[in-house]
Amino acid sequence: MSRTILVICATHRDHRELPLLAESGIDFIFHDYASTSLEDLITERAAEAGLVADPLGEIERILELVGGREIAGVISSDDYPGSALAAAVAERLGVPAPDPEITLICQHKYLSRVMQENHVPDAVPPFALIDVANGVSSPLPFPIFLKPVKSFFSIGAEKISSEADLAIRLPRWKELDQFFLPLDRMLWRYAGVSIGTKRLIAEGVLNGRQVTVEGYAYGGTVSIMGVVDSIMFPATLAFARFDYPSALPKGVQARMVEVATTMMEGLGFDNGLFNIEMMYDRETGQISIIEINPRMASQFADLYEKVDGTNSYRVLLDIAQGREPSFIRRQGRYGFATSCVLRSFVDYRVEAVPSDEDIKRLATLYPDIRVELHARPGRNLSDELQDGQSYRYGIISLGGRDLADALQKFTACQNELGIVLRPLDSSPSEPLRAFDLRTQAQGASGTVEALVPSGVAARPSRAHRKGAEPGFSSQCPPRHDGVRFRTNGLKAPDHRRGA
């Protein structure tokens, strides 16, 4: 008997991975969000972006798409708004999925911090809301880390060193109501709380080694799949690559697993995947939560497959159909896997990229490789969605015996791809191929190499982005004492952390 899986806000990885894993008799319905891309609303393209589809209306449109078909499961690997829409649609269809309220609370960086303080207070930095509309000063001592309550690719997240610096940064967020509107609308519908669309979160600055702890919850039990190291380009917040398994000491990883398990069990998160970004300060031994994502980390799906033998999309499909997943360990073809980001810190014109046939030929040389291209010929790197600090133009994920073997393969693959980038201030086209492993980024056992294009200087761009017209606003006191939620007995602590 055929079974149908509904994929909400389908991504390019969904289209790539799911057909490879699908059992016979499984069909997919791929849903696309009926709106201007939300990402555009927090970039320089915001002024040209159209209106955002009402998320509550989108739920009804998705149900109309389904029609009378029987749905065996609902999934989404999309961060925003996909995971929240999927939880809401699954609830309506009566199939397993995380609770919509818990999903939304995790997605809202401020409300998530409130719940973290309830369950794992020792892993939470000082935090407070900032009212953008009134231009209030930071209630925390500088330096602070300023974040929107929701974002993509860390856009808008930056270290602020003074009141003067804060005053410069705040105006751009005053007119971005449309971006925050879907989350605020759904929070009111499913959690009975609204923080409004003109608030940012200030946090104490975290230092150390960044990792992602990923796991799943099924039948009320939380299981951890793995810990993935995040390696940054030196002196930046830009990811260079993601390494699995983590090189952190086993004892540190065990503490992180305990924090993640306590947090997700305390929330009552169930029937889904999650990933929690954490920071480990080697000097103090402190473990801190950066943020909780109530979804799978799709970029890591094939890393687990390479090392453990189980693609995390398989776990997602099993849970969505009400089946207990089986995540085996260290049964893959490789001892190590990495996902390397092709990134520049200056803008380039894209002259040429490899064809699909070129990538297929590369896969015959390096089995199990995954190549993603985010650059298009005839366009500048800055024309694509970027973080405002650098220019990502591709991802190469592969396995190896160890880190050195994987990086050697990566360098060879990058050269084989033959991506041609032209400097904007010159006419000759020069292939950007050779990667220099001179620079060092902090690693678990001292240092590990970070991949930096030869001759590319770190020169971040900071474009001021004009926002879209406001569409919805509601007021809520900028405090986190007494915040109450509609279900699950969730209540914020009766004190203000970091004030």
How would you describe each model-predicted region?
Residues M1-I102, D131-N134, S344, R376-Y391, ...:
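ATP-binding N-terminal substructure of ATP-dependent carboxylate-amine bond-forming enzymes
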Residues A87, E91-G156, P171, E175-Y190:
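A conserved helix-loop-beta module that forms one wall/lid of the active-site cleft
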Residues D122-P125, E163-N207, A238-F239, T262-G266:
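Conserved ATP-binding module of the ATP-grasp superfamily
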Residues P126-F127, I144-E175, D184, Q210-T212, ...:
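Glycine-rich phosphate-binding loop of ATP-grasp-fold ATP-dependent ligases
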Residues E158, I168-P171, L200-G204, Q210-I231, ...:
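Beta-strand scaffold of nucleotide-dependent catalytic cores
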Residues A254-I276, P294-E351:
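Active-site "cap" helix and flanking loop/linker of ATP-utilizing ligase/carboxylase catalytic domains
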Residues D270-E283, I328, S429-L437, V448:
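A short glycine-rich, hydrophobically flanked beta-strand micro-motif that places a catalytic Asp/Glu
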Residues S344-P377:
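Glycine-rich active-site loop/lid that clamps phosphate-bearing ligands
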